[in-house]
Curated annotation (Swiss-Prot):
PROSITE patterns, A to Z: RDRP_DSRNA_REO
GO CC annotation terms, alphabetical: host cell cytoplasm; virion component
Main location: virion
Positions of the RdRp catalytic domain: 686-894
EC numbers on record: 2.7.7.48
Cell location: Virion; Host cytoplasm
MF (Gene Ontology): nucleotide binding; RNA binding; RNA-directed RNA polymerase activity
Lineage per the UniProt record: Viruses, Riboviria, Orthornavirae, Duplornaviricota, Resentoviricetes
Function as written in the Swiss-Prot or TrEMBL entry: RNA-directed RNA polymerase that is involved in both transcription and genome replication. Together with the capping enzyme P5 and protein P7, forms an enzyme complex positioned near the channels situated at each of the five-fold vertices of the core.
Coiled coil: none
Protein name: RNA-directed RNA polymerase P1
Basic residues biased stretches: 979-989
Length: 1458
């Protein structure tokens, strides 16, 4: 695509997309489809397209995948050339060449880096891999020429950008060496604590290649060059063609240099596959990182455009930092350290010349404009059962000058001056000038815009990856030494004695008090399970969020074909182990280093172990099990932070904690039914301090601190400890468990059962009582040894502290932090002048925030005294705290990744749009892209830019990435291949008779699939407005014909391999239950399983089999429950209700296994591949037959029509609290009002708490959706005695009488709303969560004709219309409107009668009631004869016609606060 094509075809269409209002939305979307089609053709080569006459939005697009080297190389050279031309298009030469000298210096530095073989041991073990040359430029050039001159099959194993099949290439060839002077390769020694010699050898070339691949790969889901092209295109459109990227200029000059003037060689030496994977890096080590820097930098400029508005100074600062990073790709940590304290103490200096000027000075806005909350008092502690914001108004003045002077102390000034000097020392003069702007107080959003802009520069490196072993050792070794010194201090007045004197009794008392409250029934809804309940409900303890439990891999022979299968399902892991998950006999209580373990073996045993290791008969994980060692995993973060360790817990320890302390965790999660009595956690009283009590996914959790920052009357004190887990000693944790044990011992019945865990070494009584389980776990946690492994290097670490994979990590960290905070508050009150009083506090694991009434604070000495008290106390309690990071501020703060300033809230721009932290676990490309859609949605809702632009950007990227690979043998090759390549392809296919070659094609589903809702198989559900995913109503009202034109095709996109393997496995394990096989449809479309071999990364896993899980589940069935369930099933049959066998209680073991197998994923390369028959079928369908019916997937939307009425008289001057939102989000907040009061408990599509509680209480695997479907499809409610029928139904699947009665009452009391996939609307999790979305507030934007419909149904329509209004507001350039809902009268009568159980109360409201539609004039009368009575005197017949889903209202009842 030439620059002229982009300028003449793409630019105007994108402008029309972004500037058109509602009246032009259809044409705008057609333009979007055309742009996508053009970009896809450009990406794949229009001459490679098959059936190019087809409508791409109806049938999709098919391309031959290029595999011939020269053709592929030329195409990529063309893509890069187009990118460079686009960058230079209509840009002055002076602008283009402005930084050429610097860029030339960067390229020269790369090509003069030390050679790979010159790296010494210190280099290769450094945290960040040093820069080095992989080969000389001459060697690279010669290799490229040689590579392109060889036949496609002449080099075995060479990677290819299009990932073509290389498995059958000729072996008799010479491999091209992509590293210069391989003869200089040498052996390097890696530390290995699992080796008898404590070291292992590998080659230098292998090790650095592995590190390069592991640490540089951004894990994209698409190739970066099209992403660069799209990003630059949008930047050009927004700036009228002026945008210019010096990152792309660097790419251009580099490609010109290394190609030596040959256009076909002018491609970037970091090679990516079409799926975004980094395939190889040539010539120089850090090219992949530089590609990441360039793409991320351009993306931040585009998506956070409102922070800079493309002003010259900001763009110059951006370019300066980008060029610095390109020159110093490992320099991100230095840059981050240079501005660390500026990031904490920005906007803190009161400057009368600027702060009170109320005007713009040197381009900086000093107007005073932020929300204030006058209703909030800080004279007494704030003790409330639920945190929420109070009403706000605009603040235009500043009146806390004395407090300003106290906070901005000499110490703080020195911090800031030092950071500015560090930036200057990095030779970044423009950034230095920018940071100087961040010092003075600015009570408006502009300072937040500036701090976020600076943080985008810190985050352009994406996810940081480094040498895990080096990073772990850098922290763990020093802290282990510190801990050992602490533990060895036995003096009476020592640090250990002082802490144990006050903390351990408090820990024990808290553990005792909370346990006692739970056992006495004071914590409503929380209880200790019996031993039998624990086993029956094992699924509730092993959830997807059970960190630290190993994953499962297995090899499956299905129909003679071997599949490598993986699953991250914790349930699958449990099912493979069976009852062994409760057996502690295999867990060593004396973990050892290997060297220590060997001393316990005699010579013969040592030799046997040596031989087994040498012959690979014993794997690493088995050796770790023998030594009692656990595994350390890792996770990456952004902003160049070191990799963090994740300590993997063994399953037995996890379950023991679930039984012991799980109820405590449950007692501190969610709103407390008993209001707190005081600030502090005592055990008997939970207090107000646990963040988990108030967390709802919004900033409500710290609303009091945010409001206080606008008052000018309070101080926020923020404690930031480093490596909290490693300094939280096990010795400090055990007293809490001892308190639990004491309470359980006193409460005799709680310790009367002995089957929680097993110890097979005890011959008399195998089972363990709960107190015995506590003793075992306390002994277990005293000392562990964890082993970290990275690219062949392995280190074992002694751990006598909290480890991150434990169930109780967050809870116990919060407990200790709360106790320390209480102690600090007492000390501040008693020792600091003026006795400042704490009015509110909160802890979230290792984060703590305290808010003090500052009326008595007049000097910096008082502030410094508070800081010293905080630092001294945490230090005395064995934690590491940096005084410089202990922020005390009257206007700003950061806690648990929530930032605030002067009553305004914002987020760090750390979410990455392009990169992934980990390799996707999705089973197919549709799931991958749906995951990307969710990431893009999350990214865009906090990006300070245009939501319309950013949403379009995400859709364009997804359109190019959403492709399916299809391979077929040559005799199935696609017809209609272009003649230009036909003869060449035929020649290649016949060149070597002994090789089976393939025709490989790439299929793009209909382009409308990107916005097609996910209720359609191939739909991604991406957002048009940015408000929500799956925008069904908007599509229905504005774009229905376009989306439905190819809907039938989109709904046939499927991936069979995973399903075939999982179903075949299920049939294998059900081979003795032919009735279940037939009912589940496993008798067709499956293949015989010949063999299964299990493996796991968990040290507790020595062997496994799903047969173990089935046996364990069958044994755990309660005989009494089984009898009840069978009786209920028989009663249901007697009235004609037949339940699917898989849902009955007696078949629960099999349904559990079935659920485990649904999450398996087979060979990675198949996740993007489908069978050729499907694509042939899709292509053969006439366009006229591709049309589908979207509303049939979402039938609720067929009940009504929405009409928009423009309304310009709405109030639009509400103050703005949420700054990290797009421009449209702030406009909506100004229109609707900021989030205020208690909002409804919206968690999206999920479940009514009563139904979820029933499922969890009974350990069921059925989902809430399936349970409701079962209630509906069984017809149990539409017969006589519907309540009793439901009791029998729930008893048949659970065997539990009490919970079945409770759930039946819940249903019949009309509390649930029928769930189906009809409503896909989210308030929480979208930018609308920032607005006051209470029904009393939003009703002014909605009108509904049928005003006498039941209140809950009216609420549903109100919220649908409200979201639709917000979508229209965004797409119509922030034009306010009102949405008028008219009900479809033909369906209203059936809907009202059939949507729910009809109680007597509802009957009284319904009989003879007239429902009228003001527009149509139609009146519907419902008389008593239309409702037949039943034998149940309380309820009437329900004839289910249509299930209704209202997920976001499920916690509401009439009259509840909105």
């Amino acid at each position: 695509m030439s620059g002229a094509d982009v300028e003449s075809y793409i630019f105007p269409r994108i402008r029309e997309i972004l500037t058109g209002g509602i009246s032009g939305i259809r044409e705008a979307y057609i333009n979007e489809l055309r742009v996508c089609e053009k970009l896809i053709q450009w990406r794949n080569g229009s001459d490679n397209q098959v059936d190019s006459t087809n409508d791409a939005s109806v049938k999709g697009m098919v391309f031959h995948r290029v595999s011939e080297r020269n053709e592929l190389q030329n195409r990529y050279a063309g893509l890069y050339d187009d990118l460079f031309k686009l960058n230079n298009n209509n840009v002055d030469i002076d602008v283009i060449t402005k930084h050429d000298e610097t860029i030339d210096k960067i390229i020269s530095k790369e090509l003069k880096s030390k050679m790979w073989y010159e790296l010494n041991d210190e280099d290769i073990h450094s945290s960040l891999l040093p820069e080095f040359q992989i080969q000389t430029l001459d060697d690279y050039y010669d290799n490229m020429k040689k590579y392109l001159s060889q036949d496609d099959r002449d080099e075995k194993g060479n990677d290819n950008r299009e990932e073509e099949d290389v498995k059958n290439r000729n072996d008799n060839v010479t491999r091209i060496q992509w590293q210069t002077l391989m003869e200089k390769d040498r052996k390097v020694k890696l530390h290995d604590d699992l080796s008898f010699s404590n070291e292992v050898e590998t080659s230098l070339s292998t090790y650095i290649n592995l590190r390069t691949k592991e640490e540089m790969d951004p894990r994209y889901v698409y190739h970066p060059v099209p992403a660069l092209f799209i990003t630059l295109t949008l930047l050009k459109v927004l700036t009228g063609g002026k945008a210019f990227s010096y990152g792309v200029r660097y790419l251009e000059k580099l490609c010109k240099t290394i190609s030596k003037g040959e256009r076909s060689l002018a491609t970037y030496p970091a090679i990516f596959g079409s799926n975004g994977e980094l395939v190889a890096t040539r010539l120089y080590s850090h090219y992949a990182i530089k590609m990441r820097l360039i793409l991320n930098n351009m993306t931040y400029l585009l998506t956070y455009k409102s922070c800079h508005e493309f002003k010259d100074f900001y763009i110059d600062v951006n370019d300066e930092v980008l060029l610095y990073m390109l020159e110093n790709p490992n320099g991100g940590r230095d840059l981050k350290k240079a501005v660390t304290r500026l990031n904490l103490y920005y906007g803190l200096r009161y400057n009368p010349k600027t702060t009170d000027s109320l005007k713009i000075i040197d381009g900086v806005d000093y107007h005073h404009e932020h929300p204030k909350y006058s209703d909030r008092s800080y004279d007494a502690p704030i003790i409330e059962p639920e945190n929420h914001f109070s009403a706000s108004e605009q603040c235009y003045e500043h009146n806390a000058k004395l407090l300003n002077q106290a906070v901005y102390s000499k110490t703080v000034k020195e911090y800031i001056d030092s950071d500015i000097k560090k930036v200057k020392d990095l030779n970044l003069p423009l950034l230095t000038k920018f940071t100087e702007k961040l010092v003075d107080m600015r009570c408006n959003k502009s300072i937040i815009y500036d701090i976020v802009f600076m943080r985008t520069l810190l985050n352009m490196g994406g996810y940081s990856r480094s040498n895990q072993i080096t990073d772990f050792k850098g922290t763990i070794d020093d802290i282990t030494k510190m801990n050992d010194e602490y533990l060895s201090d036995v003096s009476e007045g020592g640090k250990r004695a002082k802490m144990s004197e006050w903390m351990y009794p408090k820990m024990e008392a808290c553990g005792y008090g909370l346990t006692k409250s739970i056992l006495n029934g004071q914590m409503v809804g929380v209880s200790y399970p019996s031993a039998s309940e624990s086993k029956a409900h094992i699924e509730s303890y092993i959830t997807p969020n059970s960190a630290g439990i190993g994953n499962l891999r297995f090899d499956v022979d299905v129909g003679g074909k071997m599949y490598k299968v993986r699953t991250t399902s914790k349930s699958a892991f449990v099912n493979a182990l069976g009852t062994n998950i409760f057996n502690i006999d295999t867990i060593s209580m004396e973990p050892m280093f290997l060297s220590e373990y060997l001393t316990h073996l005699n010579q013969d045993e040592k030799m046997l172990l040596y031989d087994r290791r040498k012959n690979r008969q014993i794997q690493d994980i088995e050796l770790m099990r023998l030594c009692g060692q656990n595994v350390i995993g890792s996770r990456s973060t952004t902003a160049w932070r070191p990799v963090r360790p994740i300590y993997i817990n063994v399953i037995q320890a996890h379950l023991a904690q679930a039984f012991i302390i799980g109820p405590h965790i449950n007692a501190t999660v969610g709103r407390q039914r008993t209001p707190p009595k005081g600030l502090w956690f005592t055990g008997e009283d939970v207090g107000i301090g646990f963040a988990t009590i108030y967390q709802n996914g919004t900033s409500d959790v710290i609303s009091h601190a945010i409001e206080a920052s606008a008052s000018g009357r309070c101080l926020s004190v923020l404690a930031d400890c480093s490596s909290w887990d490693q300094t939280f000693l096990t010795e400090s944790i055990i007293p809490y468990y001892q308190g639990i044990k004491r309470a359980i011992s006193e409460f005799g019945q709680a310790d009367s059962e002995n089957y929680y865990m097993y110890d097979n070494q005890r011959k008399d009584v195998v089972g363990m009582r709960l107190t015995e389980t506590i003793d075992w776990f306390n002994e277990y946690q005293k000392k562990r040894i964890f082993n970290a492994s990275y690219l062949g290097e392995r280190y074992s670490f002694k751990v006598q502290y909290m480890w991150s994979g434990r169930l109780d990590t967050f809870f116990m960290n919060s407990v200790q932090n709360a106790l320390i905070t209480e102690r600090i508050a007492n000390q501040v009150s008693s020792s600091v002048a003026g006795s400042p009083s704490l009015v509110w506090f909160q802890v979230a694991g290792d984060d703590a925030i305290m808010v003090y009434n500052a009326n008595s604070i007049t000097s910096s000495d008082q502030v410094d005294a508070i800081r010293k008290t905080v630092v001294d106390e945490y230090t005395a309690d064995n934690h590491i705290i940096n005084p410089q990071k202990t922020v005390i501020s009257h206007i700003s703060g950061e806690y648990a990744k929530i930032y605030y300033y002067a009553g305004m809230h914002f987020r760090d721009p750390s979410i990455q749009l392009h990169e992934s932290e980990k390799i996707s676990k999705a089973t197919n490309i549709t799931e991958v892209m749906r995951g990307y859609a969710q990431v893009a949605f999350e990214y865009n809702k906090r990006a300070i830019g245009s939501l319309r632009i950013n949403s379009l950007y995400a859709r364009l990227l997804a359109s190019l990435a959403y492709s399916i690979n299809v391979k077929r043998s040559d005799d199935e090759s696609i017809e209609n291949k272009p003649n230009r390549r036909g003869s060449k392809a035929k020649a290649r296919s016949t060149k070597t008779n002994n090789l089976r070659s393939f025709s490989s094609v790439k299929y793009y589903p209909p382009l409308t699939s990107v916005i097609t809702p996910t209720g359609v198989k191939g739909g991604l559900g991406m957002s048009l407005s940015g408000i929500s995913l799956n925008e069904i109503l908007m599509i229905k009202e504005l774009l229905l014909d376009l989306v439905e034109a190819g809907l039938k095709i989109v709904d046939q996109v499927s991936f069979e391999q995973n399903e075939i393997v999982s179903k075949s496995l299920m049939r294998h394990f059900l081979r003795d239950r032919k009735d279940l096989i037939k009912e589940m449809g496993l008798d067709k479309g499956t293949k015989p399983v010949m063999a299964v071999r299990y493996r796991s990364s968990d040290s507790a896993f020595s062997s496994g089999n799903f047969e173990n899980g089935i046996s364990m589940r069958l044994e755990s069935l309660d005989s009494h429950k089984l009898s009840i369930a069978r009786q209920s099933e028989a009663k249901l049959k007697s009235v004609g209700v037949n339940l699917p066998k898989m849902y009955t209680y007696e078949n629960l073991p099999y349904s559990t296994i079935n659920q485990s197998l649904k999450g398996i994923t087979i060979d990675k390369d198949l996740s993007r591949m489908t069978n050729s028959d499907l694509v042939d079928q899709l292509r053969s369908i006439p366009e006229s037959e591709c049309k589908g019916n979207l509303i049939s997937k979402y039938p609720v939307y067929g009940l009504f029509n929405a009409r928009r009425i423009i309304s310009m008289d709405e109030k639009v001057d509400n103050p703005i609290r949420y700054i990290s939102t797009p421009d449209e989000g702030k406009a909506l907040e100004r229109l609707i009002g900021s989030r205020t009061g208690i909002q409804f408990k919206n968690q999206g599509y999920g479940g009514s708490p009563a139904i979820v509680r029933f499922i969890r209480r009974n350990g069921l695997t059925i989902t809430e959706e399936n349970l409701i479907d079962l209630v509906i499809s069984s017809g149990a409610i539409s017969l006589a005695n519907p309540k009793q029928n439901m009791i029998e139904l729930f008893q048949a699947i659970s065997g539990d009488q009490q919970s079945s009665l409770e759930l039946a009452n819940f249903f019949m009391n009309e509390k649930p709303h029928w769930e189906d996939k009809a409503i896909s609307i989210t308030i929480n999790g979208s930018i609308l969560e920032n607005c006051d979305s209470r029904i009393s507030n939003i009703s002014r934007f909605v009108s509904i004709d049928a005003i006498r419909i039941p209140g809950d149904i009216k609420k549903m329509f109100t919220y649908i219309a409200y979201v639709y209004m917000c979508q229209m507001f965004i797409l119509d350039e922030n034009t306010p409107s009102k949405i008028h809902i008219s009900i479809n009268e033909e369906q209203l009568r059936d809907f009202l009668i059939s949507a729910k159980p009809i109680s007597k109360n509802r009957m009284k409201q319904t009989i003879d009631m007239k429902f009228s539609n003001q527009n149509s004039g139609v009146t519907i009368e419902i008389d008593e004869e239309s409702l037949s009575r039943t034998a149940d005197l309380d309820y009437e017949v329900l004839k289910l016609v249509h299930p209704l889903s209202v997920p976001f209202l499920r916690n509401l009842s009439e009259g509840s606060p909105m």
